[in-house]
């Protein structure tokens, strides 16, 4: 795998099976420009398009992370949910891995009330409040907390609307994409040959079902974000050190003046 966080090698995509699309009879004509051909009635994706699109998307999220912006990872189907949660947590980004609740973006103010309730219940569980309740009351609150955690746990620390969303399987996550577009939030999407690329700002033509391929996509996206955050830290450190160097020069320049004054 390439060391560059904003470069997706074609070899990695080939090995992961990213070029295998869906059966030809299920294709979406809007994806025609990204299709190389067909083999055994399976569409083959032109990975030259995939590499170019992926590198553009990686560069974009890398830049967002360098500005301390947030990218919401979205993948609720079985092939994606596990790695979405794992890599989003590794990159310190919000995620939705269970089910997209209508209004997660467009009704954020109302949703924030549920998030506050979740945090309140978590605090009660930690500070011993649950232990003071009857078994039935404690069980009810525990179940309520677990339900909220499953639905909202990945976005409870998002703090506001994300600056972009990254989606695995754009058809499966159509509601999330629609909400993002309504709010002008850029969408990065893995788009298979059977999917509709409309409303996706960064179209990455690739297989969206193979677990190995999905793991590759999400991991590389997280890598690019982590690299962007590290770059921001380096820049912040350099900026903090610069005044200190100037102070030293000022002190050195002032020393002869003090001597001449004597």
Curated annotation (Swiss-Prot):
PROSITE patterns linked: RIBOSOMAL_S2_1, RIBOSOMAL_S2_2
Ribonucleoprotein is among the record's keywords: yes
Stored InterPro entries: Ribosomal_uS2, Ribosomal_uS2_bac/mit/plastid, Ribosomal_uS2_CS, Ribosomal_uS2_flav_dom_sf
Organism listed in the record: Psychrobacter sp. (strain PRwf-1)
Protein name according to UniProt: Small ribosomal subunit protein uS2
Gene Ontology CC terms, in alphabetical order: cytosolic small ribosomal subunit
GO biological process: translation
Family the entry assigns: Belongs to the universal ribosomal protein uS2 family.
Phylogenetic classification of the source organism: Bacteria, Pseudomonadati, Pseudomonadota, Gammaproteobacteria, Moraxellales
PANTHER family: 30S RIBOSOMAL PROTEIN S2 PROKARYOTIC AND ORGANELLAR (PTHR12534), SMALL RIBOSOMAL SUBUNIT PROTEIN US2M (PTHR12534:SF0)
Stretches for region Disordered: 236-262
UniProt keyword list: Ribonucleoprotein, Ribosomal protein
Gene designation per UniProt: rpsB
Annotated GO MF terms: structural constituent of ribosome
Superkingdom assignment: Bacteria
